Amino acid sequence: MNNRTLLGLSLLTLSVSTGQAAMAAGEKGEGFIEGSSLTILNRNLYFNRDFRKGQSSSSGNGYSEEWAHGVIGRFESGFTEGTIGFGVDAFAMLGLKLDTGDGRSGAGGTVDVMPYNSLGQAEDNYSKLGGAVKTRFMDTEIKVGDVFPVSPVVHYGDARLLPESFRGVTVVNSSVEGLSLQGGRLHSMSQPNTSSMRDGFATFYAGEVDSPWIAYFGGDYTLNDNVGFSLYTSRLKDAWNQYYAGTTLSYPLADDVALIGGLNYYKAVDEGKLNRPGFRGGLNS
C-alpha cells in the first residue's frame, strides 16, 4: 500500500500595480512603469510518503516527509512606448525548511522538496534569482533569459515548493485573430529543488535527460467559443522528436455551466541516442 499526501497552501498573495486603477481585466497599460506589476506569493507545502504497509520505496526508506515554506516574488514591467517596445521581467524566490530530518528526506528518502547536501541532509534554505529582457513589435513578443513556457510540449512545472524555469529564447505571435503561435529554443532549466539555473532537462518519458537544447513550435486556433485546435512539435537534441495534436470542446449547459472535453495525441520518436529499451521505435499516447 502506498499512502501519499501532498498538501499545498497559498497563504498570501500581494499584488502591487502602477498606472490606471480601473484598467480593464487582462489589459496592461502602455509604458514601462504604467504597465508594470509586482506579485508576492507565500506558499506552504507539506509532502508525505508512507510505504510502511507492505510496499517498499526504491530508496529502501519506509517513511518520508518534508514541510517547507516558499516565497515567490515576480516583477513584470510594461513596454516602453514606440514602434518597438522594450521591457524586463524578474523574479526572486526563497525556500525555507520548516520540518524534516535524517531518513525522512534528501538522499536517504523519497521526497525531494528541499535540496540536500553531501551528507544527504536537507538544506535549511535555498533561493532562485533570474530574469529576462523582452521586446514587442506589433503582435509579436520576444523574451530572452529565464522564461516560463506554457505549451503541450514544453511546460514549466509548478507542483512543488518553487516553480521550474527555463533559460533561452521564446517568441509569441497573435497577428491572426483566433490564432496564437509560439516557439522557442531553451538550453537549460532550473529544477524545483535547486538554486542552479543550468540543470538538465526533466522529462515525462525518461526523467532527467542530458541534452544541449530543446526547441519547440506550434499554435492554438480558436474556431469559436466552443471549439479549438492545437498543433505542436518539439525536438530534444540527441533524445527525441515529439509531435502533438489536440482539440478543446465546450458545450454550454446553462449561462454559467458548461461541459468541457477534448482529445490529445502525442507521438515521440527516438533519435537513437537515448539508449532506453522501452523507448525504441517511439511512443504514442
Give names to the regions the model predicted.
Residues 156-163, 189, 211, 234-244:
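Solvent-exposed loop/turn segments connecting transmembrane beta-strands
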Residues 179-205, 210, 214, 256-285:
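Outer-membrane beta-barrel translocator/channel fold
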